[in-house]
């Protein structure tokens, strides 16, 4: 019998006529015995449905509109103290229902907390990034020095010390020039080329001198032979 009665109860959205009838019954009998009120009102609704409809929508003492700053502060403090006990928190906020407070918390404060957590996370990442950048610069400086030492780079005196040593006139060493083994090999190679070229020039000069001497010797021999021939001819004619 009760099962059939429950099947005949109306469910779903409330109609305007149902709201008006429930308000009239509650104004006459008060907020009590919701199952009895549901039967007396003639509404095909359960007592729980009538109670929730009254408390969340039809009660004239309900506050409409957004939460005030004072209400936000109370919700924040009580939630930190009691957690998700929304009915207990609603008793401290007249005109606000537990369901309204719960929805407000989920849609506002949770987003605020997530935004704060994200802000802290980005701040932590930013600080870590600066620290990592600083460590990276230190590592690069150390690696550069190590590489210079491994390849035999020799650091010459700095510009300031070069100016002091040269009386304010800085040569090539005054500007901190670095010489590597590769540069030394290039210099040696250029020197070898210059030496070979000089030897080649000397060889050419020697060859030229030899040719000149040979030419002189040939000329002298030809002159002597011609002179002897002339003297011989004169002796024949005389």
Swiss-Prot record:
Record bears the keyword Repeat: yes
Induction data: Accumulates in etiolated seedlings in dark conditions.
Predominant location category: nucleus
CDD domains found in the cross-reference section: SANT
Superkingdom to which the source organism belongs: Eukaryota
DNA-binding positions: 34-58, 86-109
MF annotations from Gene Ontology: DNA-binding transcription factor activity; sequence-specific DNA binding
Motif (Nuclear localization signal): 31-38
UniProt cross-references to Gene3D superfamilies, sorted A to Z: Homeodomain-like
HTH myb-type domain location: 6-58, 59-113
Keywords: DNA-binding, Nucleus, Repeat, Transcription, Transcription regulation
Subcellular location(s) of the protein: Nucleus
GO biological process, one term: response to absence of light
GO cellular component, one term: nucleus
Protein name, entry field: Transcription factor MYB27
Gene: MYB27
